[in-house]
């Protein structure tokens, strides 16, 4: 399994299917629109004879990819490189069947055409293996890129969150580690690593050194995932709090139990609840315990720099997913993406089989520029954004609906796949129709239920009252803890004079 949360205010959670295709000899494809400044492609590369079918970020062979950007050192960027990480991920899915093939596609193209983007961590999974590949550019005018790829051991969980995570790595174990020839020498040439200093070479130290901000907003997320997957390790918060001498977190750990898709959904839903960094606590959470902090993440006050906590669950998520790639099932059934739009905390993860041949309207219509009740992305945004106004009261109702839907879908999964397997034995087209109808219908049904939930919440929580559905409106006011803060800050502002005996009735 791999996961992804695409967190950016300009990301719309629409899906597309790219059909498999055969291509003519000599066919070229345009590449290299990496930034808004790239009005035209930076270059062209040859097309291959055949490209595989791709649904979102999973292809017909159950190969799945995801990413997080860590940027790295600006000096490593190469504006002459023509390939960016987004294009390279697409090309991996179109041209590779396994994770190792995907790494060869990625690094081969980088070697030939140059990497022109910022530092990236990329998760790659097939039915047998999971890898993390990290890459930076080779500097202005440089060739290729600088990269390392590490296989995550079976039975372990790894996490990366906008910060390079690969430290030391084995140089003579190609079954578990691959790297570019310049992975160390480039850092030495730039003065970012001194082999005579007596310290081992660590990729993240050379190419994306930790800063107080990175530790706070990136490594806290890593710590939170690993500590919840393996609480027995009792991982310390010292590193992400920037305490001297604290060591970085391991790239991967053995979880205390085997993780199910539902367990992984839970790992993606986090505001550090129950820790010293719980975002539902404190004056910054407001009267109703909201864990959401509007950007920017950092600010200065009286010359001192501060930073909000940055959790996995955040308001600007465009979409997220959890994939399953299973060798014991035929590809159309074994490849499954549990897909959700908007904030991970309030989304519903819905099953999309890689064998489906049509998309639900709710995930393939609309845009960022115009609201639509037909779009799942907009409907889920309505619910999440409105629930922010009285988080402690509304979000439990949202999560009750979420649990109801996801529990039902997880319970149905074995029977659905058993039926699909039986159909595959006699009629592959009927199997495809069955999986498509199942996935599409549940997306549309859930979107309709979420529209109803939006209407219900807006009716019940209105104008500061809570409506009980029987023409009665309850005054709920503010929590006592919040009222005490108000009085502490302005003790005389709201105090009423004591009643005089003559005024008492």
Predicted regions and their residues:
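Soluble extracytoplasmic regions of secretory-pathway and membrane proteins
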Residues: 3-8, 133-135, 271, 278-294, ...
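Substrate-recognition/cap regions that form aromatic- and gly/pro-loop-enriched pockets
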Residues: 286-423
């Amino acid at each position: 399994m791999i996961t992804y949360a695409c967190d950016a205010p300009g990301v719309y959670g629409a899906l597309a299917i790219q059909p498999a295709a055969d291509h003519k000899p000599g066919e070229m494809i345009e590449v290299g629109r990496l930034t808004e400044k790239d009005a035209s492609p930076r270059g062209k590369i040859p097309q291959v004879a055949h490209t595989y079918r791709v649904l979102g970020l999973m292809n017909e062979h159950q190969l799945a990819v995801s990413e997080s950007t860590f940027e790295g050192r600006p000096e490593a960027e190469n504006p002459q490189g023509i390939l960016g990480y987004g294009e390279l991920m697409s090309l991996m899915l179109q041209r590779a069947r396994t994770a190792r093939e995907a790494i060869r596609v990625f690094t081969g193209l980088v070697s030939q055409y140059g990497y022109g983007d910022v530092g990236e961590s990329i998760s790659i999974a097939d039915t047998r293996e999971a890898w993390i590949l990290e890459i930076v550019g080779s500097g202005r005018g440089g060739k290729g890129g600088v990269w390392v790829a590490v296989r995550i051991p079976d039975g372990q969980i790894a996490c990366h969150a906008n910060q390079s995570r690969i430290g030391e790595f084995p140089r003579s174990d190609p079954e578990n580690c691959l790297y570019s020839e310049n992975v160390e020498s480039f850092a030495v040439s730039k003065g970012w690593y001194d082999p005579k200093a007596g310290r081992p070479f660590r990729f993240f130290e050379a190419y994306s050194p930790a800063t107080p901000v990175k530790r706070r907003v990136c490594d806290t997320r890593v710590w939170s995932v690993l500590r919840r997957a393996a609480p027995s390790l009792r991982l310390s918060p010292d590193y992400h709090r920037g305490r001297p001498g604290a060591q970085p977190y391991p790239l991967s750990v053995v979880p205390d139990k085997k993780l199910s898709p539902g367990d992984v959904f839970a790992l993606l839903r986090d505001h550090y609840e129950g820790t010293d960094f719980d975002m539902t606590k404190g004056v910054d959470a407001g009267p109703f315990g909201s864990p959401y902090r509007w950007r920017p993440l950092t600010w200065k006050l009286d010359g001192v720099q501060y930073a909000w906590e940055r959790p996995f669950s955040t308001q600007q998520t465009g979409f997220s997913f959890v994939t399953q790639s299973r060798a014991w099932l035929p590809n159309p059934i074994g490849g499954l993406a549990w897909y959700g739009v908007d904030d991970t905390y309030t989304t519903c993860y819905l099953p999309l089989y890689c064998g489906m041949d049509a998309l639900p309207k709710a995930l393939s219509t609309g845009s960022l520029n115009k609201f639509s009740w037909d779009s799942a992305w907009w409907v889920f945004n309505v619910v999440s954004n409105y629930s922010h106004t009285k988080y402690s009261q509304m979000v439990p109702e949202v999560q009750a609906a979420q649990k109801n839907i996801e529990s039902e879908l997880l319970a149905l999964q074995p029977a659905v796949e058993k039926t699909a397997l039986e159909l595959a034995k006699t009629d592959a087209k009927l199997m495809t129709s069955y999986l498509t109808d199942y996935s599409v219908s549940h997306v549309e049904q859930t979107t309709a239920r979420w529209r109803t939930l939006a209407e219900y919440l807006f009716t019940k929580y209105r104008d500061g009252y809570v409506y009980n559905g029987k023409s009665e409106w309850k005054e709920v006011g503010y929590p006592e803890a919040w009222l005490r803060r108000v009085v502490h800050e302005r003790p005389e502002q709201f105090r009423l004079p004591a009643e005089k005996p003559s005024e008492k009735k």
